[in-house]
């Protein structure tokens, strides 16, 4: 079961930023099964100040069909609130984190649409306690390259042309990104990744 929320709440409140993607509610379902209370906001239907009023325990930025800078408030939200709230970005959300800290998002060397890849990792962050590699489903045509100094790559896929970044964490903030889809039923460790995010001991 997920840890209790802040400020005496019995349930952990998770703001889910929906980038207009069909996978969002699979993530919402997983969060609910893990004992959290997901609250879904569309990426262009809120103001940043409303995040402070909600005061969530965690923020999850969903996958989506566009680029990070077309994803509503996803990038500005990371830039403003990464020091204050734990954030997990999934697929487009991962790219938004990369862009927010100065990384470059470019067309991926291989188009991935429902393909399963072995994901290698170093066991840190949301990958704590997972086998390496583990199979995960990928749906993406973009990838983060030239990862900024603030982010540490902790997961990758071995491609014909080299490694593709599949995950990173911030050096100082509780901010994590995964390029693959943990909510896919073919991603064996998906729910454990979300559980690790919810149970991160970071407190503000």
From Swiss-Prot:
Gene3D superfamilies: 3.40.50.880. Pathway: Amino-acid biosynthesis; L-tryptophan biosynthesis; L-tryptophan from chorismate: step 1/5. Pfam families: GATase. The active site is at 91 (nucleophile), 181 (for gatase activity), 183 (for gatase activity). It catalyses: chorismate + L-glutamine = anthranilate + pyruvate + L-glutamate + H(+). L-glutamine binds at residues 64-66, 95, 141-142. Heterotetramer consisting of two non-identical subunits: a beta subunit (TrpG) and a large alpha subunit (TrpE). This is Anthranilate synthase component 2. It comes from Thermus thermophilus (strain ATCC 27634 / DSM 579 / HB8).
């Amino acid at each position: 079961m997920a840890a209790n929320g802040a400020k005496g709440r019995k349930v952990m409140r998770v703001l889910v930023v929906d980038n207009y993607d069909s996978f969002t509610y699979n993530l919402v379902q997983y969060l609910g099964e893990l004992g959290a209370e997901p609250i879904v906001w569309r990426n262009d239907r809120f103001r940043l100040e409303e995040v402070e009023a909600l005061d969530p325990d965690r923020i999850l930025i969903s996958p989506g069909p566009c680029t990070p800078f077309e994803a509503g408030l996803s990038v500005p939200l990371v830039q403003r609130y990464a020091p204050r709230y734990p954030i997990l970005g999934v697929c487009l959300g991962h790219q938004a984190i990369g862009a927010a800290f100065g990384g470059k998002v470019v067309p991926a060397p291989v188009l991935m649409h429902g393909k399963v890849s072995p994901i290698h990792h170093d066991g840190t962050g949301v990958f704590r306690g997972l086998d390496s590699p583990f199979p995960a489903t990928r749906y993406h045509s973009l990838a983060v390259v030239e990862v900024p100094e603030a982010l540490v790559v902790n997961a990758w896929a071995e491609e014909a042309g080299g490694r593709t970044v599949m995950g990173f964490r911030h050096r100082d903030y509780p901010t994590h990104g995964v390029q693959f889809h943990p909510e896919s039923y073919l991603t064996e460790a998906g729910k454990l990744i979300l559980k690790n995010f919810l149970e991160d001991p970071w407190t503000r």
